[in-house]
Swiss-Prot record:
It comes from Idiomarina loihiensis (strain ATCC BAA-735 / DSM 15497 / L2-TR). This is Glycerol-3-phosphate acyltransferase. GO terms for molecular function: acyl-phosphate glycerol-3-phosphate acyltransferase activity. Belongs to the PlsY family. Its EC number is 2.3.1.275.
Amino acid sequence: MTALTLLMILSAYLLGSISSAVVICRLWGLPDPRKEGSGNPGATNVYRVGGKIPALLTLWFDVLKGMVPVWGSYFLGIEPFFLGLIAVAACLGHIFPLYFHFRGGKAVATALGAMFPVAWEMALLLIATWLLVFRVSRVSSLAALVTVCLAPFYAYWIKPQYTVPVIMISLLILWRHQANILRLSSGEEKAFKRRR
């Protein structure tokens, strides 16, 4: 591993550590999403707390946190396996943000953003999977769980060189969804509702 690769891994973690949900809620004068709704600083909970525009901005910036470091590293000629580790670092930053007392989100959007520069076909397939499951179930967490469970198979099929990092990211996201899995198994997970 070169010094450049290490620098990009560190940069990805630091960029991932910027909690878009918390920053946008502060700018909009909204409550801290870690203390409201589901308690998760992600786009779905920001929608619950503040509506469509703050949620879309949160989603956009969470995607960029994964996309920017991987894209930059790709153009710097970093090898595929290490590009995967850079994606993992961005997700770790989102989950354990340095600047926000290590209280972060679930990294679904950040992981998706990390896929686009190196495997856009896979990223589109992941989006289609999430949308299909969400359309049927109206449960955001279930859509995320099904999508991340299928992600390693998609990677092996489309971009096998990224299979190991994708497995790592999928396991991280599954681990962050432990509470959701328990609520789903007990039938207590709430379906998504439009704000009025």
